[in-house]
C-alpha cells in the first residue's frame, strides 16, 4: 500500500494503524514524505516512529519542480531519496532502476491515465474531441 498526498506523517497515528493491518496481511507499505528521514526520526509527534517502523520503503524529500525527473520509478524529482527500511525490498531490485511509466486505459469513452508522463507526452496525443 502506498501513502502519499498531503503529508502522510501529519496523520501518522491513523496511518500506522492502517499499515499494521496491511503488514499483518503480508503486504508492503510504501510512504512518500516531504520530510527527510532524519527530520522524521527527530520528530516526537504521536505515531511517527510507529509508522516509520511499519514502512518498508520510504521516498523522502520535498518535490522540487526544478529537479523533475521521469528517469527513476516512483520518484518525482532528483532530490528525493528511496530508503529501504526493511529487507522486503533491495536497492538491487531492477524495478527501482527503471524509468517511470505511463499507463493509458480507454474504456467506454473514458480515458484513464496512471503514472507520470514525460513532459510533452500528453500534448502529442492530440486535442480532446
Model segments located where?
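Auxiliary Fe-S-binding modules of radical SAM enzymes
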Residues: 34-35, 41-129
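Conserved Radical SAM active-site core
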Residues: 1-50
